[in-house]
Every structure is written in C-alpha cells, then in structure tokens.
Amino acid sequence: MAYPFQLGLQDATSPIMEELTNFHDHTLMIVFLISTLVLYIISLMLTTKLTHTSTMDAQEVETIWTILPAVILILIALPSLRILYMMDEINNPVLTVKTMGHQWYWSYEYTDYEDLNFDSYMIPTSDLKPGELRLLEVDNRVVLPMELPIRMLISSEDVLHSWAVPSLGLKTDAIPGRLNQATVTSNRPGLFYGQCSEICGSNHSFMPIVLEMVPLKYFENWSASMI
C-alpha cells in the first residue's frame, strides 16, 4: 500500500500491475532521453555563438525531426496496446463477483453462490482498533482466492463511481445502467486497499475498498461460513 512521501508506484501484486510498472519505466526512460537532448540543445544555444542563422531550408533536418518522433510514438504505442488488450482478456475465471457502487459505500455479490452478498462501509475513525488505517478500513472485506483469475463485474446504483485498487493495477468505472468488467489475479496473500476514484458527492472520500487475498482453502472455509 502507499506510505507518506512515496515517490514511486505501489508494489505490484498482479501480473497486470507488473506490466504497467514496466511500461511506466519504459516510457519514463524515453521522456528522460528526450528531455536530456532538449536541455543539451538549449545549453548549446546559450553558451555558443549561433551559426547558420540565415538558413532557409534544411531537408535532412526536417526529415529527421519528422521520422524520429514517429518512431518514438510507435515504441510507446506498441507495448501500450499490448497491455490494453491483456487487461481486457478474461480466460476461464474461477469466480465472479458483482460490485455495485452507492452513495457512499460498496456492495458485493458472489454470483457463484446463492446467498453470499454484503455491503461494505468505511469504519469511522472513532471505531478504529490499534493498527488499523484511517479512512481505509471497512466493516466487510472482499475475500478472494489468490493466484486464480477472478472476474469483477462493476456497476452503480446512482451516480458515477470508480472501483480502484492501485497495487493490483485496477481502476474500472462504475456507471449506472452499464456493466463493466475487470480481472483480479493476486500473486500473494495480503490486504490490498483502494478507494473510489471518481468524484461522486460529498462523501466521495469515504468509500474505501479492501481486498483480502487468501489461499483457496481459506477462501472455501470463509465462503462456507458466510452462507
């Protein structure tokens, strides 16, 4: 999860987030090289005597500054499109969970079970136990099996919301009347925190999301106790 004064991304917990982190580093390196080149040219202009001030045509230079940006954009677009299609793929999910956004809480329904559904509200600061996180803890966590593909169906009962868990590389809009889907796959067990990421009213800041990723055996025991 995030911590104060953090400069980088959260630790990747899913294959998609690992891909997004690598793409971020790839793009940032390209930006760094371009920025270095531009600063070098500016420093030359400021520290050396200008020459060729009367040049009216430079076909070679124009060719370079047309082709080079196109190549750079292709180097950015290709891995971006690859990740985009990976995020849309859902192959044989073992579980489907329907998520509904409300003002201002989330409700969850495990569609593979008959009566496994609940609402998830933020725990007020006054009710927190020692060690719990302010504005991030909920009364009912979403318990899911780790290392297995899970399909999340996301919508809203009222206004626009956005269901986001940064460490899993997830951010999907919850739109009234529309059903969006996302894939959740966690590489390790643990608690993973997120929040509503679309301004949805006065209590927008009080819609946390907590995923508890556990081994399959523990998930089966939990689901049996909830039914």
Curated annotation (Swiss-Prot):
Binding-site positions, Cu cation A1: 161, 196, 200, 207
UniProt enzyme class: translocase
Phosphotyrosine modification, residue list: 218
Protein topology in the membrane: Multi-pass membrane protein
GO molecular function: copper ion binding; cytochrome-c oxidase activity
Transmembrane annotation, as ranges: 15-45, 60-87
Places the protein is found: Mitochondrion inner membrane
Enzyme Commission identifier(s): 7.1.1.9
Keywords, alphabetical: Copper, Electron transport, Magnesium, Membrane, Metal-binding, Mitochondrion, Mitochondrion inner membrane, Phosphoprotein, Respiratory chain, Translocase, Transmembrane, Transmembrane helix, Transport
GO CC annotation: mitochondrial inner membrane; respiratory chain complex IV
Cofactor: how and how many bound: Binds a dinuclear copper A center per subunit.
UniProt-listed GO biological process terms: ATP synthesis coupled electron transport
Record's catalysed reaction(s): 4 Fe(II)-[cytochrome c] + O2 + 8 H(+)(in) = 4 Fe(III)-[cytochrome c] + 2 H2O + 4 H(+)(out)
Pfam families to which the protein is assigned, alphabetical: COX2, COX2_TM
Mitochondrial matrix topological domain residue ranges: 46-59
Binding-site positions, Mg(2+): 198
The protein's required cofactors: Cu cation
Purpose: Component of the cytochrome c oxidase, the last enzyme in the mitochondrial electron transport chain which drives oxidative phosphorylation. The respiratory chain contains 3 multisubunit complexes succinate dehydrogenase (complex II, CII), ubiquinol-cytochrome c oxidoreductase (cytochrome b-c1 complex, complex III, CIII) and cytochrome c oxidase (complex IV, CIV), that cooperate to transfer electrons derived from NADH and succinate to molecular oxygen, creating an electrochemical gradient over the inner membrane that drives transmembrane transport and the ATP synthase.
Family: Belongs to the cytochrome c oxidase subunit 2 family.
Subunit structure and binding partners: Component of the cytochrome c oxidase (complex IV, CIV), a multisubunit enzyme composed of 14 subunits. The complex is composed of a catalytic core of 3 subunits MT-CO1, MT-CO2 and MT-CO3, encoded in the mitochondrial DNA, and 11 supernumerary subunits COX4I, COX5A, COX5B, COX6A, COX6B, COX6C, COX7A, COX7B, COX7C, COX8 and NDUFA4, which are encoded in the nuclear genome.
Protein name: Cytochrome c oxidase subunit 2
Origin organism lineage: Eukaryota, Metazoa, Chordata, Craniata, Vertebrata
Gene name as annotated: MT-CO2
